[in-house]
Amino acid sequence: FAHVAKEETDMTGIITDIQKFSLHDGKGIRTTVFFKGCNMRCDWCHNPETISPKPQRAFYERKCIHCGHCDHCPTGGRVTIGQEKSVEEVYRELAADLPYYRESDGGVTLSGGEPLMQAEFARELLKRCRENGIGTAVETNLSLPFERMEGLLPYLDQVFFDIKLMDDAQHRQVTGISNATVLENAQRLAHSGIPAVVRTPLIPGITDTVENIGAIASFVRTLPNVRYYELLNFNPLGEEKYRALGLTCVHEGKRPLKKEALLALAQVAQESGIRVVYGQE
């Protein structure tokens, strides 16, 4: 949730990371701002450090040199994940790469976690970017009240959102919440006219079924603002993060879908008459 700084004029938020030179979250060269806190509980999340809204301590054992200076770890083996930053602090970091954004038609993408959990902070940051000619996008699970998204729309060029499962009971089981709001918000977003991309993470044995992908693709076809439907292959790179946080990775050992299986699902989606892309999450 967004906070108010001591000056009462500069809102602050909890940020886990600011990743520069990202090429997968919108057009051109981008900087991705990762917000801390998510209202879903997907057990495959490859950014588990962004789920809790509060700062956390993490221990990366492979970086430990047993020097005894744990409070000021020189190797990054012990780190605090999540820093409180003001809009101005974050914007200064983003603005440093203005020339790259302009040359590549790039910009800034808000990700997470779930940026709409800190909607006021997100809005102010997007507004600041828009005022200075920086392209903007947001990645969201689209499951929070649409009013939070509405506040961001005047300052957004593009929205990326997930539809993980069309079966509501299964969606509740694996994310902790219903998909009803997601689907309703997707339709409301379509009426806004803002360009959108729908994504499905392909989790082996859960979301990667022909039935699920076909049903999502059929729904996507009803959304006139969607530029394309993206299938994101399973990403096992989050396993170390779970260990660092003292958490169990229930999907440890699972591997991404092979190219043939990925292509087969893409063909299923294409049968709905929509543009489909696929790749690594």
Per-range role (PLM):
Residues V79, R172-S178, G246-K254:
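Short glycine-enriched, charge-decorated loop/helix-capping segments at active-site entrances
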Residues V4-K27, P204-E281:
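Auxiliary Fe-S-binding modules of radical SAM enzymes
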Residues T32-C45, A58-G77, G82, E114:
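Cysteine-centered iron-sulfur cluster-binding motifs in ferredoxin-type domains/subunits
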Residues Y91-A244:
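Conserved AdoMet/S-adenosylmethionine-binding subsite of the radical SAM
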Residues Q83-V87:
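Disulfide-bonded cysteine-rich modules in secreted/extracellular proteins
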Residues M11-G28, T32-I51, Q56:
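N-terminal cysteine/histidine-rich coordination modules
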